[in-house]
């Protein structure tokens, strides 16, 4: 049995242990705000290469670890990474984002999708996760991540990022049987992918349903929640002790429903006050978040004040400190350092109420 002190701090919190301070990491903590990342990107301009070449992905994942020592190290990857293994090719065009051509629009295309075999199509993921575990040891928790079915379907059906999601919503409201079939196939594939990440070394896995906040609560219950539950249920059948986190951008309208997904931790965006989020989700649900990424453009005193306010509102236990979205491009690295340093001193700066 591994002793508590041999278990990484974030993993202990994710399992429900009461600690002196909330663990801390940042979504997109490896990325364009860091000069070392930009230098590497200039040398290797293809995002697919940076995220699928193990040596590059490992190096990028470890850049913020070396700079700031976060309590979580998340593998550098993309939510679309498993799609080619299902028969959905994609590319990522710098400054434009993902492109899927041809997009998935017909029943025949959905029927022709193949089950995901990550050993065959995603072997680099094993190398990345195993290496990260080896590099950070028990000093940090290694996180994996996946896209949730609605968001992956939105990319695949729209063919690119979208502002209004008219094409997938058109399918949802005029040909729902095609969409439900597609969502179920994605859910099965993502459950396999999460299990694979855990088997390869991920200690916590975050599900990103980034675009589910674009759904009305009624449609969220029809097209997003059941497939989140399908993924979580299948993962928990085989890996019941691995904590799962769910993040949705613009989640204020569906926050309680996120708690119904079966995940262990709900990642709250900054549009909800953390005290209110705690009340709406109930004290038994652990939370993550939820500093506005824009706060990191403020003064360091302002950053510290916002961190203390959020931690105070979250209360003691069951909280992982994070942003309410990814780090923004152009964020000063010194302010990111201030964020992490303050977070690690929270217990001294603040008597956290029970």
From Swiss-Prot:
Single Gene Ontology BP term?
A: protoporphyrinogen IX biosynthetic process
Gene3D superfamilies referenced in this protein's UniProt entry, alphabetically = 3.20.20.210
The record's section on InterPro entries has: UROD/MetE-like_sf (IPR038071), Uroporphyrinogen_deCO2ase_HemE (IPR006361), Uroporphyrinogen_deCOase (IPR000257)
Which compartments is it annotated to reside in? Cytoplasm
Q: What is its main location?
A: cytoplasm
Q: Where is this site: Transition state stabilizer?
A: 78
Catalytic reaction annotation = uroporphyrinogen III + 4 H(+) = coproporphyrinogen III + 4 CO2
Q: In which pathway does it act?
A: Porphyrin-containing compound metabolism; protoporphyrin-IX biosynthesis; coproporphyrinogen-III from 5-aminolevulinate: step 4/4
GO MF: uroporphyrinogen decarboxylase activity
Q: Which family does it belong to?
A: Belongs to the uroporphyrinogen decarboxylase family.
Function per UniProt: Catalyzes the decarboxylation of four acetate groups of uroporphyrinogen-III to yield coproporphyrinogen-III.
Q: What's this protein's name?
A: Uroporphyrinogen decarboxylase
**Source species of the chain:** Crocosphaera subtropica (strain ATCC 51142 / BH68)
Question: Organism classification, top ranks?
Answer: Bacteria, Bacillati, Cyanobacteriota, Cyanophyceae, Oscillatoriophycideae
